[in-house]
Swiss-Prot record:
Annotated source species: Caenorhabditis briggsae
Subunit: Component of the Mediator complex.
Name the record gives this protein: Mediator of RNA polymerase II transcription subunit 31
Listed Acidic residues bias regions: 113-159
Localization (cell): Nucleus
One cellular-component annotation, GO: mediator complex
Region (Disordered): 113-168
GO process terms (BP): regulation of transcription by RNA polymerase II
Annotated Pfam families: Med31 (PF05669)
GO MF, one example: transcription coregulator activity
């Protein structure tokens, strides 16, 4: 029978370990050291699936660790994580998740109901505009100014501006 203090310590250690699984480089480290080939370690990963229960999952700061924990149940994924390029690919996907999906989700959660459709339409328009701009950029020719003109522009930019206009 565990004491309350040892239960708390075990909870904290397991929580930290599960969250460490969100780091693809750490998974690569474990795979290269042969941990994923050890039966006791694979059984430990199965045991840790209890973190998917909402009462435990709410304690996690990095919810993507649960996805990694689920993926680690697959022998194929564990084998793939031993290779650097595979770990790099997973890391890139995690970064893309942070950059785009979570930002979009946050925006959608902040909108009142009924505006979701407007956001989707405006995003489609944005994609179309970006495609048009990229097509237009292909036709642009960059002409460099002579060094004398560049120096003059740099001097003009360095001159102090009239701040009295800013106070109005």
């Amino acid at each position: 029978m565990e004491t309350p203090e040892s239960e708390k310590t075990r909870f904290e250690v397991e929580c930290e370990f599960v969250q460490a699984l969100a780091n693809p480089n750490y998974l690569n480290f474990l795979a290269q050291r042969g941990y994923f080939k050890e039966e006791y370690f694979v059984n430990y990963l199965k045991y840790l699936l209890y973190w998917k229960n909402p009462q435990y999952a709410r304690c996690l700061k990095f919810p993507q660790c649960l996805h990694m924990l689920e993926a680690l149940q697959s022998q194929q994924f564990r084998d793939a994580m031993a290779y650097g390029p595979s770990a790099k690919f997973v890391e890139d996907q995690v970064v893309l998740q942070w950059q785009f999906y979570l930002r979009k989700r946050h925006r959608l959660c902040m909108l009142p109901e009924g505006e979701d459709q407007d956001v989707e339409e405006s995003e489609e328009e944005t994609v179309e505009n970006e495609q048009k701009e990229s097509e237009d950029e292909e036709d642009v020719v960059i002409v460099e100014k002579p060094e004398d003109e560049q120096e003059e522009q740099a001097e003009e930019a360095a001159e102090p501006t009239d701040t009295s206009l800013l106070n109005t």
